[in-house]
């Protein structure tokens, strides 16, 4: 993640190696001096593309923005899956004044990975506070059952059980 943040913010750093006991991250330019970029990152495993995006989103939003494509896992344990990013997280950011869009060219599941997440970010964002004090009228809870390389019965069973809860 340090390498991803360094890429989008023209930063230098060290200590991201396996077994490191410390981390140094030094931006080399102020945010206003960053130029819009087209970035490609490969996690090289099923590591979470959405966690990488959440790491680099702030420097991209407040800097010059740009596009980012990340390959790795898009649907992982202990990480927000792409649908959460697309349907919950990014819409709230946009309500605050950000201009961010995301697409899922290819899904990648743990343990294989191989997915791709792509985002476009307009930089120089001036975000407003977001106050969520009441549940919006018409709001409802919903769920999506998504599976890969499993018999269809597994997804159907999960769907049936979630309706009973």
Located regions from the model:
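A generic, well-ordered mixed alpha/beta core segment in the N-terminal half of proteins
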Residues: 2-101
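Phosphate/diphosphate-binding glycine-rich loops and adjacent basic-rich segments that engage nucleotide
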Residues: 25-26, 31-37, 42-46, 62, ...
């Amino acid at each position: 993640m340090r390498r991803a943040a360094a890429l989008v913010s023209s930063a230098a750093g060290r200590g991201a190696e396996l077994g490191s006991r410390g981390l140094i991250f030094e931006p080399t330019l102020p945010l206003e001096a960053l130029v819009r970029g087209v970035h490609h990152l490969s996690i090289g495993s099923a590591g979470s593309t959405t966690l990488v995006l959440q790491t680099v989103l702030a420097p991209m939003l407040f800097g010059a923005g740009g596009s980012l494509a990340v390959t790795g896992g898009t649907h992982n344990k202990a990480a927000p899956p792409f649908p959460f990013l697309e349907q919950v997280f990014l819409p709230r950011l946009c309500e605050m004044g950000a201009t961010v869009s995301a697409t899922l060219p290819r899904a990648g599941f743990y343990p294989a990975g191989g997915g791709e997440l792509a985002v476009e970010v307009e930089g120089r964002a001036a975000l407003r506070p977001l106050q969520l004090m009441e549940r919006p009228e018409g709001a409802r809870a919903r769920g999506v059952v998504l599976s890969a390389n499993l018999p269809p019965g597994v997804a159907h069973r999960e769907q049936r059980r979630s309706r009973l809860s």
